Amino acid sequence: MRSIISLLLISAMVFSMIAAVPEEEGLQLSEDERGGCLPHNRFCNALSGPRCFSGLRCKELSIWDSRCLG
């Protein structure tokens, strides 16, 4: 009986912590978990390697220079 009550309390605590995370922050975490997204004006590779954050694109400025830009 105690184990059932403990399990319910732990489940309620986990659910309340998940609900407390703002939606945008949750999206940012999932982008980071996908494989290291890059912020604005960082070097990137359009074909492989780390991707830019959502809303940014890897733009080729020259043959050797590509950056995450909006």
From Swiss-Prot:
Expressed by the venom gland. The modification Leucine amide is found at residue 69. Residues 21-34 form a propeptide. The keyword Zinc does not apply. Pfam families: Toxin_7. Does not contain a cysteine at position 53 which disrupts the cysteine framework. Residues 1-20 form the signal peptide. Its main location: secreted. One of its GO terms (molecular function) is toxin activity. It is found in: Secreted. The keyword Magnesium does not apply. Keywords: Amidation, Disulfide bond, Neurotoxin, Secreted, Signal, Toxin. Disulfide bonds join 44-58, 52-68. GO terms for cellular component: extracellular region. Belongs to the neurotoxin 01 (U2-agtx) family. Insect active toxin causing rapid but reversible paralysis in crickets. No activity shown in mammals. Does not show effect on mammalian voltage-gated calcium channels. This is U2-agatoxin-Ao1q. It comes from Agelena orientalis.
